[in-house]
A protein has these predicted regions:
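Bacterial N-terminal signal peptides that target proteins for export
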Residues: 1-9
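Bacterial N-terminal signal peptides
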Residues: 10-18
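N-terminal cap/lid segment of alpha/beta-hydrolase-fold proteins
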Residues: 30-50
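Conserved HGGG/HGGXW glycine-rich cap/lid loop of the alpha/beta-hydrolase fold
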Residues: 46-99
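Active-site loop/oxyanion-hole signature of alpha/beta-hydrolase fold enzymes
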Residues: 94-132, 148, 174
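Conserved hydrolase catalytic core segment
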Residues: 127-170
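Alpha/beta-hydrolase
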Residues: 171-301
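Catalytic active-site module of serine/aspartate enzymes centered on a nucleophile-bearing elbow/loop
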Residues: 307-354
Length: 354
């Protein structure tokens, strides 16, 4: 996956405010080498446009992966293969991202859910489904589970976005500015105008907007896959899709998620939340820890929507837990599957592995 240096979610006060742990060290050899990420896995026609759907494995329930904002199937490269040993698994590129065709509809959680549900039907991937969502994908899987409650047996939400994170961030920022007035005058990175920068068809590599708009790749990805991913991300199609997702995140998508049910009965819901990280320069550690606690509380609220809900705090991780600690994500999925199929009764309160 890529990490954009200038992201709209950060600009509007995203509470996760944590460096990605994968930037700290690179593996000795590439961990992501599957050539499936060099092109479309399967282009599924969902009514005049195609969605890139990558399915592998056998076994029910099927596990459906939804990546974070501006991300694609590669977000699950360290998780999906392990789960596919025992279950059917599918990841996909949302409309306009990766190898999926662009849509003339806005990039909202409900529209994304409509797309992937149609694709699963066309591809004959039958329910029941266990849904796994990272970041903004965490809101989408909740919309899916609400809309198709009879088809969903569980959710694993990996450092998921929350419909109220922006409003809570604004309240937090007001308190922080009163405590530390310099924060009210901190520099905000300039908008790189990504869509404009890609108007020729793609953002040129020598453009000042290239790195802010395209981002950085997890260092464990094979170079050929990295190059292809960057080329796809730099394309005008991808930049328009990401801009649409950003524009709708705190408004339409948040409202769609807010309108979903607050009681999922005994459906397993396992939330994964990054542990506190060192504070960025100029921010007291106590303030950074409070930010993380607000993020944790948002996740606790989602876990409380089920009698089988739990929030695991994941040490040694940033926002990209799917790369930083893929083994934890795999354990959470396997536990949710075990509960959903009656092989386990309750989720563990915490994860045993440090």
């Amino acid at each position: 996956m890529t990490k954009r240096k200038v992201a709209a979610l950060a600009a509007i006060g995203c509470l996760m405010m944590a460096a990605t742990a994968w930037a700290d060290e690179a593996p000795a050899r590439p961990l992501v080498t599957d050539p499936v990420y060099l092109g479309p896995a399967r282009l599924v026609d969902i009514g005049g446009r195609r969605l890139n759907l990558y399915c592998r494995g056998r076994g029910s329930p099927a596990v459906i992966f939804d990546a974070g904002a501006n991300d694609t199937t590669i977000a699950w490269a360290l998780v999906q293969p392990a789960i596919s040993k025992t279950h059917m698994t599918c990841s996909y590129d949302r409309a306009g991202l990766g190898f999926s065709d662009a849509s003339n509809r806005p990039g909202t959680s409900a529209n994304d859910v409509d797309d992937i549900h149609k694709a699963l039907q066309v591809a004959h991937i039958k329910p029941p489904y266990l849904l796994v969502g990272h970041s903004a994908g965490g809101m989408a899987v909740r919309v899916f589970a609400d809309r198709y409650r009879d088809e969903v047996v569980g959710m694993v939400i990996v450092d998921g976005s929350h419909e109220d994170q922006v409003s809570r961030a604004k309240a937090r920022e007001a308190l922080e500015a009163a405590e530390m007035p310099a924060l009210a005058h901190r520099d905000v990175p300039p908008d790189p105008h990504c869509v404009d920068a890609a108007k020729s068809g793609a953002i040129p590599k020598d453009s000042p907007a290239y790195t802010p708009c395209v981002g950085e790749m997890y260092p464990g990805v094979d170079q050929a896959i990295t190059d292809k991913t960057f080329a796809v991300m730099a394309a005008l199609k991808s930049q328009k899709a990401h801009a649409s997702e950003d524009a709708n995140f705190a408004t339409v998508s948040a409202d769609e998620t807010r309108a979903t049910r607050r009681d999922f009965g005994d459906m397993p819901i396992i939330m994964l939340t990054h542990a506190p990280r060192p504070a960025p320069k100029g921010i007291p550690q106590a303030m950074q820890d409070r930010r993380t606690m607000v993020w944790e509380q948002l996740h606790n609220e989602v876990a409380a929507m089920s009698t089988h809900g739990v929030n695991w705090i994941v040490p040694r991780s940033g926002h990209t837990i799917n790369y930083d600690r893929p083994e934890i994500v795999i354990d959470a999925i396997n536990l949710a599957l075990a509960i959903a199929t009656g092989q386990a009764s309750q989720p563990k309160v915490t994860h045993d592995q440090p």
